Amino acid sequence: MDHLPIFCQLRDRDCLIVGGGDVAERKARLLLDAGARLTVNALAFIPQFTAWADAGMLTLVEGPFDESLLDTCWLAIAATDDDALNQRVSEAAEARRIFCNVVDAPKAASFIMPSIIDRSPLMVAVSSGGTSPVLARLLREKLESLLPLHLGQVAKYAGQLRGRVKQQFATMGERRRFWEKLFVNDRLAQSLANNDQKAITETTEQLINEPLDHRGEVVLVGAGPGDAGLLTLKGLQQIQQADVVVYDRLVSDDIMNLVRRDADRVFVGKRAGYHCVPQEEINQILLREAQKGKRVVRLKGGDPFIFGRGGEELETLCNAGIPFSVVPGITAASGCSAYSGIPLTHRDYAQSVRLITGHLKTGGELDWENLAAEKQTLVFYMGLNQAATIQQKLIEHGMPGEMPVAIVENGTAVTQRVIDGTLTQLGELAQQMNSPSLIIIGRVVGLRDKLNWFSNH
């Protein structure tokens, strides 16, 4: 280990930055956030330093570097574009046994600045020892995505509860299980973020008073249309906290690779007209796992509330008194159209968009007359097997046969295929495609040749 990671208490302690440019400004922000009593020395300063000085946040010393500025300092940073001056600052600090950071010169410094994830009071520092700052930054960005933004507020609140929790729970094991519940409770985190005192109190009392082996909870998470990069930040956090993940075939392998390694995985894949696991059985799986006290994620392709039967699953949980929440996802219509260069709305061509299921419950019938109207975009989910019927019905109700159409297969994935044509060709085009596919009908499809960015990558 080349460096010892430490966290310094700098509040109301003298610190010095030598340099008045953009790099020095970034370092100054960190020291000011830490509460340091800051002096900045340079021949000239960018406007931000002047603004800080006018606000009484720091002291500016304009002119050449004077070693006496270090006499009362706890810590110094050399952040000029003059290597010789930076070296001089470092040597003067070393002689006084003051830790000094030299920007972009780790060998000349007695300490280095890590990449920081600030969820105060929780702090995470990432460093490559100065050998690869870009790698440290990339790792920090990945860690940022794993730590909820409100985690710091939850940590502060936990500090206020420590005394009560110690009284309530007799053993270390009980206290540990309580804290684990508290830190993954979304309602508490959101209530703290909103400063909703009533909800904070209610949630806290519920967490403290319910048995530690209480029923679990279910989170419906939309996995998006295929590309793992389209999974939301909150969705990622949820699947990495899950004890059980119940997923279907529309969830890509790339997304499943993000699931916590020790989580149980239950595949309930479904296809139009064929259910690997009946919907009622899926409902019971969610209920059964939650009643075991587990944190269950129901992971669905697209958005769980858009043709995902999420509402049906939640009704079962609601009737059984199981807590649940929903994390929306990017629905297939949005993802597939964007990755195909087809805007769903356009001032010249479509003032509305309709999302339509391609198969209905027995006896269901669509309002084809309204669907055949101009100035709108139609998006059919699970409509591949009904493409010929869709073509026939729309033409019968007045939609022009030359209306542009497109079918998107495996939308947003690297295996995405798009085929386009006219409404009179829809049934024939569908025979060339496989599920999962999405059908888009409307004048906006005509923009695809111009706006198709994804295939060019």
UniProtKB/Swiss-Prot annotation:
<dbReference type="InterPro" id="IPR036291">
    <property type="entry name" value="NAD(P)-bd_dom_sf"/>
</dbReference>
<keyword id="KW-0520">NAD</keyword>
<dbReference type="InterPro" id="IPR006367">
    <property type="entry name" value="Sirohaem_synthase_N"/>
</dbReference>
<comment type="subunit">
    <text>Monomer.</text>
</comment>
<feature type="binding site">
    <location>
        <begin position="22"/>
        <end position="23"/>
    </location>
    <ligand>
        <name>NAD(+)</name>
    </ligand>
</feature>
<feature type="modified residue" description="Phosphoserine">
    <location>
        <position position="128"/>
    </location>
</feature>
<feature type="region of interest" description="Precorrin-2 dehydrogenase /sirohydrochlorin ferrochelatase">
    <location>
        <begin position="4"/>
        <end position="204"/>
    </location>
</feature>
<protein>
    <recommendedName>
        <fullName>Siroheme synthase</fullName>
        <ecNumber>2.1.1.107</ecNumber>
        <ecNumber>1.3.1.76</ecNumber>
        <ecNumber>4.99.1.4</ecNumber>
    </recommendedName>
</protein>
<dbReference type="InterPro" id="IPR050161">
    <property type="entry name" value="Siro_Cobalamin_biosynth"/>
</dbReference>
<dbReference type="GO" id="GO:0009236">
    <property type="term" value="P:cobalamin biosynthetic process"/>
</dbReference>
<comment type="similarity">
    <text>In the C-terminal section; belongs to the precorrin methyltransferase family.</text>
</comment>
<feature type="active site" description="Proton acceptor">
    <location>
        <position position="248"/>
    </location>
</feature>
<dbReference type="InterPro" id="IPR037115">
    <property type="entry name" value="Sirohaem_synt_dimer_dom_sf"/>
</dbReference>
<keyword id="KW-0456">Lyase</keyword>
<dbReference type="InterPro" id="IPR028281">
    <property type="entry name" value="Sirohaem_synthase_central"/>
</dbReference>
<dbReference type="InterPro" id="IPR003043">
    <property type="entry name" value="Uropor_MeTrfase_CS"/>
</dbReference>
<feature type="binding site">
    <location>
        <position position="411"/>
    </location>
    <ligand>
        <name>S-adenosyl-L-methionine</name>
    </ligand>
</feature>
<dbReference type="InterPro" id="IPR006366">
    <property type="entry name" value="CobA/CysG_C"/>
</dbReference>
<feature type="binding site">
    <location>
        <begin position="43"/>
        <end position="44"/>
    </location>
    <ligand>
        <name>NAD(+)</name>
    </ligand>
</feature>
<dbReference type="InterPro" id="IPR014776">
    <property type="entry name" value="4pyrrole_Mease_sub2"/>
</dbReference>
<dbReference type="InterPro" id="IPR019478">
    <property type="entry name" value="Sirohaem_synthase_dimer_dom"/>
</dbReference>
<keyword id="KW-0511">Multifunctional enzyme</keyword>
<dbReference type="InterPro" id="IPR012409">
    <property type="entry name" value="Sirohaem_synth"/>
</dbReference>
<dbReference type="GO" id="GO:0051266">
    <property type="term" value="F:sirohydrochlorin ferrochelatase activity"/>
</dbReference>
<dbReference type="GO" id="GO:0042803">
    <property type="term" value="F:protein homodimerization activity"/>
</dbReference>
<comment type="pathway">
    <text>Cofactor biosynthesis; adenosylcobalamin biosynthesis; sirohydrochlorin from precorrin-2: step 1/1.</text>
</comment>
<dbReference type="GO" id="GO:0006970">
    <property type="term" value="P:response to osmotic stress"/>
</dbReference>
<feature type="binding site">
    <location>
        <position position="382"/>
    </location>
    <ligand>
        <name>S-adenosyl-L-methionine</name>
    </ligand>
</feature>
<dbReference type="Pfam" id="PF13241">
    <property type="entry name" value="NAD_binding_7"/>
</dbReference>
<dbReference type="Pfam" id="PF10414">
    <property type="entry name" value="CysG_dimeriser"/>
</dbReference>
<feature type="binding site">
    <location>
        <begin position="301"/>
        <end position="303"/>
    </location>
    <ligand>
        <name>S-adenosyl-L-methionine</name>
    </ligand>
</feature>
<dbReference type="GO" id="GO:0051287">
    <property type="term" value="F:NAD binding"/>
</dbReference>
<dbReference type="GO" id="GO:0043115">
    <property type="term" value="F:precorrin-2 dehydrogenase activity"/>
</dbReference>
<comment type="function">
    <text>Then it catalyzes the NAD-dependent ring dehydrogenation of precorrin-2 to yield sirohydrochlorin. Finally, it catalyzes the ferrochelation of sirohydrochlorin to yield siroheme.</text>
</comment>
<keyword id="KW-0489">Methyltransferase</keyword>
<keyword id="KW-0808">Transferase</keyword>
<feature type="binding site">
    <location>
        <begin position="331"/>
        <end position="332"/>
    </location>
    <ligand>
        <name>S-adenosyl-L-methionine</name>
    </ligand>
</feature>
<dbReference type="GO" id="GO:0019354">
    <property type="term" value="P:siroheme biosynthetic process"/>
</dbReference>
<dbReference type="InterPro" id="IPR035996">
    <property type="entry name" value="4pyrrol_Methylase_sf"/>
</dbReference>
<dbReference type="Pfam" id="PF00590">
    <property type="entry name" value="TP_methylase"/>
</dbReference>
<keyword id="KW-0627">Porphyrin biosynthesis</keyword>
<dbReference type="GO" id="GO:0004851">
    <property type="term" value="F:uroporphyrin-III C-methyltransferase activity"/>
</dbReference>
